[in-house]
Amino acid sequence: MRMIAFFFVLIFSVQFIQAQDAGVDIKVRLEGSSASSIEAFLDNTDRSFVANTNRVIEVRNVHEGQHTLTVFAEGYAPQSIMVNASAELPVPNYNVGLMEVTYDLTEVEVVEANRSSLGMKQLKYIEVDGLYAAKKNDIVVTDEMAANISTNNSRQVFSKVAGINVQETDAGGLQMGIGVRGLDPKRTTNFNTRQDGYDISADALGYPESYYTPPLEAVEQIELVRGAASLQYGTQFGGLLNFKMKRGSEEKALEVVSRQTVGSCNYLGSFNSIGGSAGEWNYYGYFQHKQGSGWRPNTNYISNGFYAQAGRKLGNKWTVDLAFTHNYYNSQQAGGLTDRQFEVNPNVSFRDRNWFRVNWNVANVTVNGQLTKNLTINSKTFVLSSSRAALGYLGSITRTDTGGTRDLILGEFNNIGNATRLVQRFNRNGNPGAIILGSRIYQGNTRNRQGKAEGFDGPDYAFLNPENLEGSDFTFPSRNAALFTEALIPLSACWYLTPGARLEHIITQSEGYYTEQNRHPITGELLSQNSFDASTNRERNILLMGIGFVWRCRTSVEVYANASQNYRAMNFSDIYVNNPNIIIAPGMQDEKGFTIDFGAKGKLLKEVVSFDASVFMMQYRNRIGETLTTIENQEGISRIVNYRDNIADALFVGVELVEEVDVTKWLFPNAEWQLTWFNNLALVDARYQNAEVNAFNGNRVENVPVVNYKSGVNFRNGRFASGVQFSWISDQITDASNAEFFPDATVGVIPSYQVLDATVSYSWKRLKLEGSVNNIADQIYFTRRAAGYPGPGIIPAQRRMVFMTLQVKI
């Protein structure tokens, strides 16, 4: 009830800022035959208008001045006209003649104008595969960002996305770790992570960590939708993170792009892609190789990956796309440090036998079709067959690795799924609307094994006793079926309503055995060992509901609000984990809650300022977290461990503001160069409530910087482009007790840090030269305390790194 009351207070507060502008009517007359579907889009906005039964498009509430209106009709070429809105003149009428042509559905979908500002855009209200009105969303256009994309530098790539918290784990960008609104950034686990709309994480329900990140050199854009994405995409409080891959050139039969990068710490990156179109076919593929090391010892890595995609048009209304992704990398893990070791010399490493390997394979088939003039279908069927292996000494960083056998943890993931969506477009009094109906069927099977491996120094990923493991052997089957619907309902020319609901049926199981070993806390001597069989079976139905509103009477500004329920299934690591630093509580429950957004976005001062400002509240119930506790083994010896359980509820409230000033348009409107200045600020307060341990009430939630600030300047002049950005992240805590120090450094404070990055580029004909310097001031800091791999302990971030890239495009 409190959620509903708070939400409607926000909605009705919009009434105080309503205003009306001049209306414009536009008559569209077609030459030859008549078209039954006519739609128009207004420049520099995402507003669209549908013709009524008399084939008249009424554009209402446009601010005064000249605008470009682009008209589309099925079977006809697009036509753009200039229209003039003035409160002092009668409502103007325009006639537009359209010429008949042949084109396909996908061409219509991508033409609509987006609000864009140097690498940033917004999703359209109605996309081919979903509805995004009334949702906080961002599109990052990778080729337009001043960023080091060879190493997937998240700090630069997401510099204009509010509240992104980056966790650094390796120098080559092998894994991406980002979180929003105070959610844990480890391997992007709190996002529903996808590539071209299909799953790429280990297991969407029980193991949502992303061990594979698409190379940003092959990514056209990155789409982010906050918590309200739960209705269309299911579990995860963070929302949707989708990497939209590039496609082959529509103008060439063959286009080749080769990018060669060298950098600090022996970095070598080679990215080579081909793409093009031939008849009804479009294709794209790449091969990428990366190798190098971090600035610490024992951090060597090598990575190889390739991607192949082919699409074919089946007439004018259907397309079929096939894609396959492979990624392999092997990296040495330097291990963690204690607080004292980090202070004395963060360059050291006390682990030289720890390794990590990933072998990722994903295949997908996508079918897009137009069933009727206003009804489209999008269906994706994907298969994932992948593995990851962690090898090394798992003991506390306070213990010396004296050799001997190592621990090997091997995870194997085999998943298959289908997601199908129907989008029905309609118009109500000349205003566009749509209803989406979707389904998802998913089956996953994860096998996780842990045991002893050879005591060599190299990456020998083989168990000594595969039939009788010393640690554990579990299979985790999971099944998921879901139905959802969401609608974009125009209430008037200004107001839009977006109700939705999702019904989930989830089954997660586990079956296997584990071995308990009791060791002396000081000497590590094995005192006793026992094996136990274990199994679980959890079946549940989850109903998620949500509603949103959009108000947009002025074309340059819109106000949005939404409230949606969220859900996060227990991970497999919440069922069982064999790690001497972590104890799992029996009987843990799934996490539930809701998210509320209220914000405004658009352009001000004659489009000099672009902005997106919002406030949010996220209620997290049964939050799973870790606390320090003392346990006693069978021999009566006590030790302190991290205890994982449903520890409390949590309330997150925050403010997010991103603004960018076009200095050139403001001060030098006739200049050919462009200078922009952006600021990105997120303020988040996250506190525990209703905790079983009273001392936790009011404590800060883990991995939540209260202040997350980024600012930067971007400059472009012809072939030259550059960007400089500054990041400042306030301190974070890492457990629910808010402990500031622990001897093995698995919990404690992550101090505030500041980082400066810069990128420049120069293009000449077919060549492009890029240079990046990350962490210009050579700051010493860290973003993670790990309880297991790649630690345990403090994982230092990268020091100053310099990169140079030469690109050839033929």
Language model features with spans:
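Extracytoplasmic beta-strand/coil segments of soluble accessory domains associated
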Residues: D138-V140, I149-A202
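Transmembrane beta-barrel wall of Gram-negative outer-membrane proteins
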Residues: G23, V262-Q291, R296-Q332, W355-L375, ...
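Gram-negative outer-membrane beta-barrel transporters
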Residues: L422, N429, A493, S614-R621, ...
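C-terminal beta-signal and adjacent terminal beta-strands/loops
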Residues: E626, T664, Q674-L675, W728-E740, ...
